[in-house]
């Protein structure tokens, strides 16, 4: 019997998305941050603040490569570094087959899903497993130390492959981009840091309103929000003629006056009336996700 829970090899993007989301949780966020980032001997808040300061100019205009992508990549690497650290701290108490299962469940099955292993890689992995099986269970620490370091180096190179990293990053981003509570918490976290930087005179002024929004961003926000006002849920999908365009408002979730940015993650669709009423107030989303449809028997009974 394996000492590890069976994990779906398809759940890596969900796992990373969950870690990123949990890192901003009011009650448990600091615990998640510490759990994964103390290995790097880095203070999460200090690192985040330094990153925002370094890339502040990029938050002034919408870019397809968002700040959230960098945030995701940090958790992507921190997650695997965490697995490696605790494995190396305890593996000599394990059975050989459990060691092999660990690598298969945590690394190999996931790399296979993304077609990140070629025939040469598979042969190398099998040769490593053969060394494991031929080792002395009574003296694992001494016998396998160099082999494990070589194996983790191999896995690290695979995980750092840009094509794989960007693919997983896009999957995680897609999961988080539809989560309104996360977007509010994430944008508010950034806004608080930006206000702090302004107070410390590390930046001259807050982000200003852009002269225009690129069509790719408008399309993304419109289709993500199902052409629906995110406050009153008015259907705006028919408001696409020149006469009706003023009814569509691409609102900053966290107002610029309160430290908000022009990062794509800080926009939502509102109708003209709701946008006017919201003004520069902070307003949490009424729904975490946009419904595809409402079931009649549950309508008005559930808060999503």
Sequence positions of predicted segments:
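Mixed-charge, low-complexity interaction segments
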Residues: 1-196
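Short, Lys/Arg-enriched, disordered terminal segments
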Residues: 1-4, 289-304
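General structural signal for secondary-structure boundaries
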Residues: 174, 183, 214-215, 282-285
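Short, charged surface segments at domain edges that flank catalytic/cofactor-binding sites
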Residues: 188-235, 294-297, 302
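Histidine-centered nuclease catalytic patch
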Residues: 234-269
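Short Cys/His-centered divalent metal-binding micro-motifs
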Residues: 237, 267-290, 294
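Short Fe-S-cluster ligation motifs
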Residues: 260-273, 277, 298-304
């Amino acid at each position: 019997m394996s000492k590890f829970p069976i994990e779906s090899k398809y759940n890596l993007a969900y796992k990373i998305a969950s870690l990123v989301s949990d890192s901003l949780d009011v009650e448990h966020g600091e615990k998640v941050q510490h759990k994964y980032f103390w290995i790097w001997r880095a203070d999460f808040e200090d690192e985040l603040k330094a990153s925002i300061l370094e890339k502040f100019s990029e938050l002034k205009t919408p870019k397809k490569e968002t700040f959230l992508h960098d945030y995701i990549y940090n958790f992507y690497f921190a997650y695997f570094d965490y697995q490696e650290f605790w494995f190396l701290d305890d593996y000599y108490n394990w059975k050989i087959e459990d060691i092999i299962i660990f690598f298969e469940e945590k690394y190999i099955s996931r790399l296979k899903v993304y077609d990140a292993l070629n025939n040469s890689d598979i042969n190398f992995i099998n040769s490593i497993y053969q060394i494991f099986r031929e080792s002395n269970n009574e003296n694992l620490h001494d016998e396998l130390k160099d082999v494990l370091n070589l194996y983790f180096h191999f896995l690290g190179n695979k995980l750092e492959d840009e094509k794989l990293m960007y693919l997983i990053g896009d999957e995680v981003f897609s999961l988080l981009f539809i989560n309104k509570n996360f977007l509010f918490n994430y944008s508010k976290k950034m806004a608080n840091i930006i206000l702090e930087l302004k107070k410390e005179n590390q930046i001259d002024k807050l982000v200003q309103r852009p002269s225009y929004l690129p069509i790719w961003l408008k399309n993304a926000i419109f289709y993500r929000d199902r052409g629906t006002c995110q406050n009153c849920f008015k259907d705006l999908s028919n408001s696409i003629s020149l006469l009706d365009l003023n009814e569509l408002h691409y609102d900053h979730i966290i107002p610029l006056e309160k430290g908000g940015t022009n990062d794509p993650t800080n926009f939502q669709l509102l109708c003209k009336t709701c946008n006017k009423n919201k003004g520069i107030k902070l307003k949490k989303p009424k729904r975490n996700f946009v419904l595809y449809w409402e079931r009649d028997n549950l309508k008005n009974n559930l808060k999503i």
